[in-house]
Amino acid sequence: MLRVILSVVAAVGVVATMPVAAQQSAGPRVPLVQDDTSDPDAQALFKELRARGTSPLNLHRVYGNAPKLARATLAVAQALRYDAIVSRADKELIILRATQLARGDYQFGQHRRLAISCGITVEQIDSLPQWRDSKLFSDRQRAVLAYADAMASAQGVDDATFDAMKAFFNTKEIIELTMNAAYYSASSQISRALRITAEGNPKGGGYGTCR
């Protein structure tokens, strides 16, 4: 019996000292709600997703454990995507940088596909960590990236960075970009805390395409 207890304690200790990335590979911390769920709200959530042309992703199946909140949250995501005037390419660029800074691997992976379909190049995406030294970005894109960096910093957005945004975007567009960066930064925290893992190549194109 003592030997069994010591083995369990040792195993727990190994998990506790594992790097975050290794722990995340263990999979989601909460159940993935399946299609045959008896919860009518979760069923409604999945039905709405399929009506939009995508199968429920792991993110949605985790959210399905709190389906009413999930539907409200995803309604915000839909509004950010489709009810905005700022270009999809600019939105995807700030989302990529915001999720990268928030270490949201799940969201970054999904939006990488979206960004490419919106005209962001693979070379640009790969150079995001060193974007300040890159010649691949326009002045407009550099203003967006600097804004994302400032939003994620402890110091916040300074006047010079905000003024650079005003040179390319009107007030509504700046608010839309700000909300996209903030929303997906928060979503990244959720996916990290709950260890939401990628699906590989999901049916329905993941988060969709630039349309």
Identify the residue ranges that each predicted region occupies:
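N-terminal secretory signal peptides that target proteins for export/translocation
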Residues: M1-L2
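Bacterial N-terminal signal peptides
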Residues: I5-A16
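Hydrophobic alpha-helical segments
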Residues: V14-R211
